[in-house]
């Protein structure tokens, strides 16, 4: 398992210096880590779509942005991602937890969204990678997304 500190340090190495998102129990340690960081700015959002807007504004102001959300809120990001980010080529990194992953037993309310999450990303032309478990694989994924 990748620690929150390792993730934050790796993202910082690639220049990610602005984080936003909505609370998610699976991301608590990462959210707390960026809140407590002296190098990274964090602004909490009231909705996933708002987080995309905040991150996009930060990019326009010269920041490299990360949005942290649960996949159950992915639907709330579709309009800003397709109308704002796609149209104006505004890059942001989405860290999206995958509740309802068909390979992992989860709560019933996450079942449908878990099944369709990857399809939503594909249909909206959002490049995506499954979050790696090993630190070395995280470095490879970050190198890949940083060069795309």
Go through each PLM region and give its residues.
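Thiamine diphosphate
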Residues: 1-148
């Amino acid at each position: 398992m990748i620690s929150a500190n390792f993730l934050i340090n790796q993202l910082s190495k690639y220049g990610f210096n602005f984080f936003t998102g909505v609370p998610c129990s699976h991301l608590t340690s990462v959210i707390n880590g960026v809140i407590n960081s002296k190098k990274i700015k964090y602004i909490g959002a009231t909705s996933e779509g708002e987080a995309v807007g905040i991150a996009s504004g930060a990019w326009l102001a010269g920041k490299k942005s990360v949005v942290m959300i649960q996949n159950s809120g992915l639907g709330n990001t579709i309009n800003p991602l397709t109308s704002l980010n796609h149209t104006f080529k505004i890059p942001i990194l989405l860290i999206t937890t995958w509740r309802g992953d068909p390979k992992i037993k989860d709560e019933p309310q996450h079942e449908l969204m878990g099944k369709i999450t990857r399809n939503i990303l594909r249909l909206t032309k959002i490049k995506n990678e499954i979050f790696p478990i090993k630190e070395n694989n995280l470095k490879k994924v970050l190198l890949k997304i940083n060069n795309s």
